[in-house]
A protein has these predicted regions:
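C-terminal cap/substrate-recognition subdomain and adjoining C-terminal extension
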Residues: 24-37, 42-43, 59, 146-197, ...
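Short, compositionally biased low-complexity segments
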Residues: 21-25, 114-124, 251-255
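Non-catalytic pre-domain segments flanking phosphatase-related domains
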Residues: 3-15, 20-66, 74-100
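Active-site flanking residues adjacent to catalytic metal/cofactor-binding acidic residues
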Residues: 64, 68, 296-298
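A metal-dependent, Asp-based hydrolase signature
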Residues: 75-79, 83-84, 89-173
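A generic alpha-helix surface/boundary motif
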Residues: 74, 126-127, 205, 276
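Mobile, glycine-rich extracellular loop/lid and propeptide segments
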Residues: 71
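Short, flexible, glycine/charge-rich loop motifs used to bind or transfer phosphoryl groups or to couple energy/partner
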Residues: 51-53, 68, 215, 284
Length: 365
């Protein structure tokens, strides 16, 4: 039986009693700069505006997952069948080192790369998460950018197949669909002096192609996009990565343009940006002590550590949850309950059950 956790999850916005209040204006806007949060439920918009007003222009930052949090659907999971259907990415053209297990072919059916990816996920997330980024190795970034733009403009679903109970099953995969609400939130945060970072379990370079391209509206600085980083091989045969270039202080517009000619390799940089690695990435690339005033996600296992460890609740920080699956909602509710118990047991400030905003994907369009 599911444990009773009504006190934790029934409220859209749960506020610590010790959190100082900010007087709310009649319109709930707090005199903030940037776009209004028109594509948000009223209560959620009010909570977000209140938090932004309290933390504006004070050295704070927010972190967001990308797939299914900042836009609807998954970039890698749709780009893979899209390129396979075009004949651009196939088992014959993929790096041979990425054939981790045999393909599941039959006399009448050749397994798709999408199906292969799903079977790797059945083994372990730690197998398929990196593979989903590595599979795009061998492509120059400029070529991949062209395909990503094609995919983002593609107004149809992408047909592919996978195995379900050992039977070949047809399916349709949706390309990413921009959440207008998140575009508003990103830009309102930045307009009020709060930096925005993306911390994604997807390929950093692929995510950057959307998050940092002005035509998609997010306007995230390229250096603020953190994801699964793969080494790039330049035309001179040298290896590098955006993360190294940023650390070395050479990630200029000129360097970014040169990177478009560099080829993605299958070699991974660390830390790996999924599960606890998301929190590790924040500590490594953003700040060891200044915690985010907002952390947003949609997948309990992958985003949970960043959300629970990260949010500065003492400053009114928000745990933002895009509530896309009943099973995931039940799982995150259970994590809230268990983490609250654990914090109390250890005599720590209880933050796990404070300041949650839950929003459905349909409410962000």
């Amino acid at each position: 039986m599911r444990p009773s956790i009504n006190l934790v999850v029934n409220a859209l916005w749960l506020t610590s009693l010790s959190t100082p209040s900010v007087a709310a204006p009649s319109n709930g806007n707090y005199g903030l700069k940037g776009p209004e949060l028109k594509h948000w439920p009223a209560q959620a918009a009010k909570a977000l505006n209140k938090m932004i007003a309290r933390n504006a222009n004070n050295g704070r930052y927010a972190v967001f997952d990308m797939d299914n949090t900042s836009y609807q659907f998954d970039l890698e999971e749709s780009l893979l069948p899209y390129l396979e259907n075009k004949g651009v990415l196939t088992r014959e053209t993929m790096d041979p080192a990425l054939k981790l297990v045999p393909f599941k072919d039959t006399k009448k059916h050749k397994e798709s790369l999408y199906s292969y990816y799903l079977r790797l996920c059945e083994i372990e997330d730690a197998v398929c998460y990196p593979w989903a980024a590595q599979i795009f190795s061998g492509f120059p970034l400029g070529e991949l950018k062209g395909y990503v733009d094609e995919l983002m403009a593609y107004n149809k679903t992408i047909p592919t197949t996978y195995f379900e109970d050992d039977k070949v099953t047809a399916t349709e995969v949706s390309p990413p669909k921009i959440f207008e609400g998140q575009v508003e939130l990103y830009n309102r945060l930045m307009a009020n002096g709060i930096k925005v970072y993306v911390v994604s379990a997807a390929s950093e370079e692929l995510v950057r192609m959307v998050a940092s391209d002005p035509k998609y509206g997010y306007n995230v600085p390229p250096q603020n996009v953190i994801g699964v980083s793969l080494f790039l091989k330049t035309k001179k045969g040298e290896i590098t990565t955006a993360r190294k270039q940023i650390e070395d202080g050479v990630y200029t517009q000129k360097t970014q343009k040169q990177n478009l000619d560099a080829e993605m390799t299958p070699w991974l940089w660390a830390p790996a940006t999924w599960k606890s690695g998301k929190w590790a990435a924040i500590l490594t690339y953003i700040d060891e002590w200044n915690r985010p005033i907002l952390a947003g996600g949609d997948t309990p296992d992958s985003d949970g550590p960043m959300i629970f460890q990260g949010v500065d609740v003492a400053r009114g920080g928000i745990h933002l949850w895009v509530d896309r699956k009943p099973a995931y909602r039940e799982q995150i509710d259970g994590m809230i309950k268990n983490n609250t118990i654990a914090q109390k047991k250890e005599g720590l400030p209880v933050t796990a059950d404070k300041n949650w905003v839950f929003v459905k994907p349909t409410e962000l369009h």
